[in-house]
């Protein structure tokens, strides 16, 4: 038994090492990719200093952090709601952040500073997450909780559409494209949002013991002495913060939080000591690759990254849904 445990631990460490190496490679690829490819040898040329360090580097860092945040949010929500299909985009949390952001733009007449818009997006994500947690406490079945989340997402989406349709503000109409997901407008001025993600990401990755207990179910976690009320509320705040900041940076990006934790579990990373850092690395890799595709797929144009992740993630979600019903 001890030998098997050691073998599994070594296998998990190898997985994390491979994911770390792959993330570094995709980071380099992201800095090179664009309408004009710039190889590492040219990064310190006058042209490279402008395109790589001033334009592509802040975008790449934002993609990396948002991918890690969304994947971790999915893993946390799946343990928190005891629901393998829980995911920020699917359960309406991302749309809730969008409603908060659009409400801030609408009520503030476009005069609010960037930090206030970010806080409103975080507040919107927190409100939807708290509503979902309220539903979860009523011991709804997996399918009913999923439907409740989808319904909340539809309501939030309808609110955003109505606000944008009747608005004469260019800022609100511009948000319609932005809510499809994209990092085109990210620069060093949004560095404070990136910094705001880092401590929460690191803190979540260190909470493997509590996450393992939550994954066992409410009854087992309580018997093991876990203060459920405290951890539920803390994790709700952490998840809402990560999703809200991610939406403020890049708009609504779906399926990363659903697909990444499932793929890693299928690869054997079931212990949250390995699953959480693995989700952060794999989420960063997946979104970096999607961002590269979004940049280079069309000539002189850029695809919304939400379209790329939805196109790749929707078939995987259907497969997971059919598998969970089997």
From Swiss-Prot:
This protein's UniProt keywords: Cell inner membrane, Cell membrane, Membrane, Transmembrane, Transmembrane helix, Transport
Molecular function (Gene Ontology), one example: vitamin transmembrane transporter activity
CDD domains reported for this sequence: TM_ABC_iron-siderophores_like
InterPro entries the UniProt entry points to: ABC_BtuC-like (IPR037294), ABC_transptr_BtuC (IPR023691), ABC_transptr_permease_BtuC (IPR000522)
Transmembrane segments: 15-35, 61-81, 88-108, 112-132, 146-166, 184-204, 240-260, 274-294, 302-322
Cell compartment(s), UniProt: Cell inner membrane
Highest taxon, organism lineage: Bacteria
Gene Ontology biological process terms in this record: cobalamin transport
Keyword Cell inner membrane: yes
Broad class of where this protein is predominantly found: membrane
GO CC annotations on file: plasma membrane
Pfam assignment, any one: FecCD
Membrane-topology annotation of the record: Multi-pass membrane protein
HAMAP family (alphabetical): BtuC (MF_01004)
UniProt similarity note: Belongs to the binding-protein-dependent transport system permease family. FecCD subfamily.
Subunit structure: The complex is composed of two ATP-binding proteins (BtuD), two transmembrane proteins (BtuC) and a solute-binding protein (BtuF).
Function summary: Part of the ABC transporter complex BtuCDF involved in vitamin B12 import. Involved in the translocation of the substrate across the membrane.
Name this polypeptide is given: Vitamin B12 import system permease protein BtuC
Gene name per UniProt: btuC
């Amino acid at each position: 038994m001890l030998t098997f445990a050691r073998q599994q631990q070594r296998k998990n460490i190898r997985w994390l090492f491979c994911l770390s190496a792959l993330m570094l490679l995709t980071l380099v690829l992201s800095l090179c990719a664009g309408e004009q490819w710039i190889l590492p040898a040219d990064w310190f040329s006058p042209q490279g200093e402008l395109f790589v360090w001033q334009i592509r580097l802040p975008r790449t860092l934002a993609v990396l952090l948002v991918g890690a945040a969304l994947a971790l949010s999915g893993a946390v929500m799946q343990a928190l709601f005891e629901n393998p299909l829980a995911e920020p985009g699917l359960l309406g949390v991302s749309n809730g952040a969008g409603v908060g952001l659009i409400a801030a733009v609408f009520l503030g007449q476009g005069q609010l500073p960037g930090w206030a818009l970010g806080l409103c997006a975080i507040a919107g994500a927190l409100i939807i997450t708290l509503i979902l947690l309220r539903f979860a406490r009523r011991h709804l079945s997996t399918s009913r909780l999923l439907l409740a989340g989808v319904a909340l997402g539809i309501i939030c989406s309808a609110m955003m559409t109505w606000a944008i349709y009747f608005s004469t503000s260019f800022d609100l109409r511009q948000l319609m494209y932005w809510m499809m997901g994209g990092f085109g407008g990210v620069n060093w001025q949004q560095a404070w949002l990136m910094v705001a993600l880092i401590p929460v990401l690191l803190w979540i990755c260190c909470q493997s013991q509590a996450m393992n207990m939550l994954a066992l179910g409410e009854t087992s976690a309580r018997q093991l002495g876990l203060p459920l009320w405290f951890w539920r509320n803390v994790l709700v705040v952490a998840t809402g913060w990560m999703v809200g900041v991610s939406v403020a940076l890049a708009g609504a990006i779906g399926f990363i939080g659903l697909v990444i934790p499932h793929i890693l579990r299928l690869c054997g990373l079931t212990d949250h000591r390995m699953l959480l850092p693995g989700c952060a690395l794999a989420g960063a890799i997946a979104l970096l690759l999607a961002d590269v595709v979004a940049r280079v797929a069309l000539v002189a144009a850029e695809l919304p990254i939400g379209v790329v992740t939805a196109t790749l993630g929707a078939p995987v979600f259907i497969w997971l849904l059919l598998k969970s019903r089997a």
